[in-house]
């Protein structure tokens, strides 16, 4: 299963993440305590042996152009209402791999109806990967009944409030293509290797679970 460990800030965190994850991410141009500067991001991209996603809430193409050109990354994670025309421009101009976030409600009174609405929104986009999140890296879980329905139709990456204690059952239930974690593997606002190790072990247990 694809595992992305997001929100790194230092080379030390990068080295830990590289031992366990398939990809990582740096937070740029958005309101987050994990936000880092372009120079730091560029350094991490250059040091990395795994893909580094530039994560941002920007909807302006020029902001994404600055991110790409300064950091040198070819991987973008978009948490905004950016339109398909802008995405097409970025892909044609820079050839980037784009993961687009779609918001799932924390609780749903009608999971099937909510899932159909989100599926319709997803189908209006052409991107490389779909991320289902509770909302802009808030660190809260969402209604997995909704994401389970969507995961039956698309290869999705699941995010939102994941941690070593809940990820096994969530992976078993939703059956995503991949998962994305940040705050759930931190201790004192830094990536914790023991938490990451336990998280990844439980992801694999959930992935290999058979009814």
Curated annotation (Swiss-Prot):
Metabolic or biological pathway: Amino-acid biosynthesis; L-tryptophan biosynthesis; L-tryptophan from chorismate: step 3/5
InterPro entries tied to this protein: Aldolase_TIM, PRAI_dom, RibuloseP-bd_barrel, TrpF_fam
BP-aspect Gene Ontology terms: L-tryptophan biosynthetic process
The entry's keywords: Amino-acid biosynthesis, Aromatic amino acid biosynthesis, Isomerase, Tryptophan biosynthesis
SUPFAM superfamilies for this protein: Ribulose-phoshate binding barrel (SSF51366)
Pfam families hit by this protein: PRAI
EC code: 5.3.1.24
Catalytic reaction(s) noted: N-(5-phospho-beta-D-ribosyl)anthranilate = 1-(2-carboxyphenylamino)-1-deoxy-D-ribulose 5-phosphate
Molecular function in Gene Ontology: phosphoribosylanthranilate isomerase activity
Lineage: superkingdom: Archaea
Family: Belongs to the TrpF family.
Identification of the protein by name: N-(5'-phosphoribosyl)anthranilate isomerase
Organism encoding this protein: Methanococcus maripaludis (strain DSM 14266 / JCM 13030 / NBRC 101832 / S2 / LL)
The encoding gene: trpF
């Amino acid at each position: 299963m694809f595992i992305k460990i997001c929100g790194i800030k230092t080379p030390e965190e990068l080295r830990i993440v590289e031992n366990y994850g398939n990809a990582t991410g740096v937070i740029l141009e958005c309101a987050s305590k994990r936000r880092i500067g372009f120079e730091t991001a560029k350094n991490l991209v250059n040091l990395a042996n795994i893909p580094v996603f530039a994560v941002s809430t920007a909807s302006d193409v020029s902001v994404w152009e600055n991110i790409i050109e300064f950091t040198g990354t070819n991987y973008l994670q978009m948490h905004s209402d950016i339109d398909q025309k802008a995405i097409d421009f970025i892909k044609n101009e820079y050839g980037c791999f784009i993961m687009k976030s779609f918001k799932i409600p924390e609780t749903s009174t009608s999971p099937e109806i909510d899932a159909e609405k989100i599926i319709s929104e997803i189908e209006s986009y052409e991107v490389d990967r779909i991320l289902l999140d509770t909302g802009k890296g808030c660190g809260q879980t969402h209604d997995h009944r909704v994401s389970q329905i969507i995961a039956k139709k698309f290869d999705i990456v699941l995010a939102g409030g994941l941690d070593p204690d809940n990820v096994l059952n969530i992976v078993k239930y939703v059956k995503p293509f991949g998962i994305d974690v940040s705050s759930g593997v931190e201790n004192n606002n830094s990536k914790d290797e023991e938490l990451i190790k336990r998280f990844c072990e439980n992801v694999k247990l959930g992935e290999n679970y058979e009814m």
